[in-house]
């Protein structure tokens, strides 16, 4: 693993990309591109979580991050209030993880064809966006307090 200066820079880049994904999700929602909005909400959360993992010495190249994130939360020496706030994000993270493939591709699914253009609704996109905003906000606040990352 690289030195902590490298990890801080790396984590900041992940947060910047998470912020961009969130903005893209908003634009796509406004233009009625619901599956793609859902996907970018998922990407926002994945990248925000990976920033925390990086600052804990973990480079994780998979899309399902909730389990590793949960373990890191339990291992970190942090105040109980932060532990609780971060653990409360897990259900939202797990819910969004379900959307890293499904919004992008039509697929055979239980004998039928899954068509994301027909399956994802405005309400789905709004809910995913709301969850992504919440997860990103809490993680950014945590990174500012725990790691002193003021400029993220």
UniProtKB/Swiss-Prot annotation:
HEPN domain location is 15-135
Cysteines engaged in disulfide bonds, as pairs: none
Q: Which InterPro entries match?
A: HEPN_dom
**Name of the featured protein:** Putative toxin MJ1304
What does the UniProt function comment say about this protein?
A: Putative toxin component of a putative type VII toxin-antitoxin (TA) system. Its cognate antitoxin might be MJ1305.
> Where are its TM segments located?
none
Origin species: Methanocaldococcus jannaschii (strain ATCC 43067 / DSM 2661 / JAL-1 / JCM 10045 / NBRC 100440) (Methanococcus jannaschii)
Keywords from the named record:
Toxin-antitoxin system
> Per the record, a Pfam family?
HEPN
Coiled-coil regions listed? none
């Amino acid at each position: 693993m690289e030195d902590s200066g490298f990890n801080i820079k790396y984590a900041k880049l992940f947060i910047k990309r998470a912020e961009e994904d969130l903005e893209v999700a908003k634009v796509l929602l406004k233009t009625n591109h619901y599956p793609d909005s859902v996907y970018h909400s998922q990407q926002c959360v994945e990248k925000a979580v990976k920033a925390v993992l990086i600052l804990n010495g973990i480079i994780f190249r998979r899309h399902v991050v909730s389990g590793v994130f949960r373990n890191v939360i339990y291992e970190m020496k942090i105040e109980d209030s932060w532990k609780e706030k971060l653990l409360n994000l897990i259900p939202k993270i797990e819910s969004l993880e379900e959307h890293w493939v499904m919004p992008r591709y039509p697929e055979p699914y239980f004998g039928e064809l899954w068509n994301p253009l027909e399956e994802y609704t405005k309400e789905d996109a709004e809910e995913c966006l709301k969850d992504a905003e919440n997860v990103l906000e809490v993680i950014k606040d945590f990174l500012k307090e725990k790691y002193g990352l003021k400029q993220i």
